[in-house]
């Protein structure tokens, strides 16, 4: 099949590999992007990307918290100019506020009443599109709650209160001091913003992701030419490293890299004054998995794609 310049560009962004390596990988895998990333990794050309997905959309992430709950919403716009508009920012805040009164799914939020209005969130967004003159999309919504404890929040590089390009929620169950729990929770949320973990615990990592990593590590190890029993130990070691990199509680804590997040939680229990448990987290980065149409492309990539 013919490999396009856009495919080469996308694979370069996903893998960090060179142009010609990306073109070869796409040719070997018939243009299958995920398979091409794996092909590059097996060759030792590309590193694992912990969460596939390109960030290409404009808009804002909004966060609102109240009592024992907090929500994240993502609303996309066509341009950053509109995202910096006060009207658009108010819409994101109000949609997040509306989400607090629901179970958090996008359907439930769309059907709920927009704050201070008799119209639904969905109808209000449609009206705003006509007013602003640019399309906007309510892309996703998520809510975390605790029975007793806190849901800490963090917005990275906020453009206004509760609004930015990346947002995180962290649920901590504890009967202890809520102020201390919230302070630690914010540190964990900042850590999550920086490290983008796949899961809370090793048991939470998707089995297909584990099998994929094992297959790639096995292929890499076999290229060493070592005996099968040595290869098995090499794979076990690389899988341990994989879990340390992608499991939140096993990651080195950004605030103190000498200890894990789990160990930091144990330390935090001293100031919290009671046992504490991180039960869930959610991380929204603006435009994850969304692509914009590219109207222009680098000449050397186009030349490479042509052959």
Curated annotation (Swiss-Prot):
Top-level taxon in the UniProt lineage: Bacteria
Entry-linked InterPro entries: EF-Ts_dimer_sf (IPR036402), Transl_elong_EFTs/EF1B (IPR001816), Transl_elong_EFTs/EF1B_dimer (IPR014039), Transl_elong_Ts_CS (IPR018101), UBA-like_sf (IPR009060)
GO molecular function: translation elongation factor activity
Residue ranges of the region described as Involved in Mg(2+) ion dislocation from EF-Tu: 79-82
Cellular localization per UniProt: Cytoplasm
GO CC entries: cytoplasm
Pfam families tied to this protein: EF_TS
Family from the record: Belongs to the EF-Ts family.
Segments crossing the lipid bilayer: none
Name used for this protein in its record: Elongation factor Ts
